[in-house]
Amino acid sequence: MKTPRPLPYHVVPCNEHEGKGMADWNEGYVTDVAYTFGYYSELNPLRSKLALLNRRLHCPDFQTGCELGFGQGVSVNIHAAAGPATWVGTDFNPAHAAFAQELSVAANLGARLFDDSFEQFAARDDLPDFDYIG
């Protein structure tokens, strides 16, 4: 049996998890299994626009998009690269968030990607009003 190759990301310690016991920091979320590196076209805001246009409804342009639970961040970073909108998102797994942040920085996309829980993310006071949430 071959030895598996290490995954292409590193874990960045997250200060927000300090003080919580090891048994409860993840709040039941599975964090010991890496998510896939896939692109999910269902999250593409242009698909929503197409559906509205097919019904002869106007779809306004959007300036700010959000992806909740972005996994490795492939989709959110592709969307950030594909248009002028500002993208923000969160994934509870610190390793996933770190990899997604590295993608954004490497491509100079400016996406703001966090490793917050949904509760922490919703409580942030530095988020814009989102035009699109996927």
Task: Identify the function of each model-found stretch.
Residues 72-84:
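Conserved SAM-binding loop of SAM-dependent methyltransferases across substrates and taxa
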Residues 95-96:
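Conserved short alpha-helix immediately C-terminal to the canonical SAM/SAH-binding motif I
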Residues 100-101:
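Conserved SAM-binding loop
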Residues 124-132:
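A short acidic, Gly/Pro-enriched loop at the edge of an enzyme's catalytic core
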Residues 108-120:
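Conserved SAM-binding strand-loop segment of SAM-dependent methyltransferases
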Residues 62-71:
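Conserved class I S-adenosyl-L-methionine
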